[in-house]
Design a protein with these regions (language model features):
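Glycine-rich phosphate-binding loops of nucleotide-dependent enzymes
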Residues: 1-194
């Protein structure tokens, strides 16, 4: 809905401007990037070709150095550099997730939306993905994270919202939500530390 892929109800504001009627391309050009749950890579294209597609915004803005962002992505995800000529359809689930995030970062976004980045990944890869999310957060990129792994999400978040049946049931600073008995009992499944 935020990226204009589904019909919306209500209004969507970004930097004080109602962008509800904006096209997907207009939202991308404003600096909003999405990593969808299903990753949506081009499986018959190489890793590097997929990354180059992510440079659309920078290219349209006339940034002649947009290709240098590929090196930034490879610094963040060294495994992708090793597989730069490999078809993305042959990558593991964790590598595909890294590529999807890397492709979004090619646009140099102000806001990065991640939809279920840990879905279907091995625990070790989930830890690696969330470490990268934390690194990105520290660089000043605003991250909007939709995640079923509440513990991992709250560990990297500044602020959180708990949705039940599509409605906000709780919200607040992530550290407070992580200690809230309702969140612990329902989503974290562990005794609260007082």
């Amino acid at each position: 809905t935020l990226m204009g892929l589904l019909p919306t109800r209500g209004k969507l504001f970004y930097r004080g401007e109602d962008i509800s009627a904006f096209t997907l391309e207009e939202r991308v050009m404003m600096g909003i990037a999405l990593v969808p749950e299903k990753r949506e890579l081009f499986g018959t294209m190489t890793v590097e070709d997929n990354l180059e597609l992510g440079g659309f915004r920078q290219m349209r803005m006339g940034n002649r150095q947009w290709r240098s962002r590929i090196d930034d992505v490879y610094d963040l995800f060294p495994r992708l550099k090793e597989r730069r000529t490999q078809l993305s359809g042959t990558l593991s689930g964790g590598e595909r997730q890294m590529l999807a995030v890397g492709r979004s970062l090619m646009s140099n976004p102000d806001v990065l939306m991640l939809d279920e980045p840990s879905l279907g990944l091995a625990p070790l890869i989930v830890k690696e993905i969330f470490s990268i999310i934390e690194t990105l957060r520290k660089t000043g990129v605003t991250i909007v994270l939709v995640e079923q792994n509440a513990r991992a999400a709250l560990a990297v978040a500044d602020y959180g919202y708990v949705l039940e049946m599509g409605e906000v049931s709780l919200h607040g600073p992530a550290a407070e939500l992580a200690q809230d008995s309702r969140v612990i009992d329902t989503y974290l499944g562990a005794a609260r530390k007082d």
